[in-house]
Amino acid sequence: DHDHDHDHDHDEIEHAWFVPEKVSEVAKEIEQRAGGSASEVTKRMDAVSERLGQLDHVHLAMTEPIAAGLLYGTELDDVTPEQYARSTLNHTDPSIDAIAAFIEVIEQGSLDFLVVNPQSTNSATQRLIDAANDNNVPIIEITETPPAGTNFLDYIEEVTDTIERVVAAAEPKDHAA
């Protein structure tokens, strides 16, 4: 057993619109300033948080931390190598060593899925996608904005649906902590 209360500050998350609590806070702020009701947004974001909170312990990695706000505080354990994650947060190209460490994580067989933002790819990302495909690691694509014609809340729920399906299909693995 290990601690899943990853010490991440949601104020520092780059893609804050993927933090259900932040979305609810913004909706309430808009309600106070402009009227209307935040209840539908709050209800839907609470449901997303609850659904993600009920998922089994699995390991994931992200080519960039697009889904961090959805996943932190859940049993979904982000095993992205720290050096790689740091480079993406700093908007720098990952080193050869960081890419190699990430590929090793994929090839070890304990990764349940890989999160990719198809709007932000490069040769390193493609190598990771290729490694995931070669090792039968499911890939979840999450974009920064909903597809054309899709409501934001619907999109967050669709992403949650996809994560639930992939986690449910994950085969038990030896997740050495």
Question: For each predicted feature, which ranges?
Answer:
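Extracytoplasmic metal-acquisition and chelation regions
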Residues: 1-177
